[in-house]
Swiss-Prot record:
GO terms for molecular function: kinase activity; metal ion binding. The keyword Nucleotide-binding does not apply. Transmembrane segments: none annotated. Heterodimer with glycerol kinase (glpk). This is PTS system glucose-specific EIIA component. Gene3D superfamilies: Glucose Permease (Domain IIA). The modification Phosphohistidine is found at H86. Zn(2+) binds at H71, H86. NCBIfam families: PTBA. Its cofactor is Zn(2+). Residues 34-138 form the PTS EIIA type-1 domain. GO terms for cellular component: cytoplasm.
Amino acid sequence: MFKKLFGKGKEVQKDIAIYAPLTGEYVKIEDIPDPVFAQKMMGEGFGINPTEGEVVSPIAGRVDNVFPTKHAIGLKADNGLELLVHIGLDTVQLDGEGFEVLVSSGDEVNVGDPLVRFNLEFINNNAKSVISPIIITNTDQAASINIYDENAVIKGETKVIDVTMN
């Protein structure tokens, strides 16, 4: 009843597709060279070894968090799914150098909307790895997660995960 009164009758879709936010090579989460991600301590997901320096939104939703160091963005879908797009590994230490954020916290985004541009060569030379984890940070709230084992992925086009939220 409250949802009808306050939610303006809008039915929230529990199913959501997560698309590749970067163009490059798909990497299984277990193969990400960082135990925090590989052991799924932050949640289920996958990685991409990018071939170009632009991140687009992998879901429709809103920007929940832009990290001050510009290396990561948190997104939230209407159904509650929370997603972290983390550009490279140990890139927090670059303190924003090599990154240009194109969105702000609270912005509405659609699949394929540009979020961040980054200097791929700079990250390659100055970070542990350019492999970029994409993590469902509230995995525990998902009823089901189906990950497609892709090879090459194209930003905003290749569907990588189907999620049904509780």
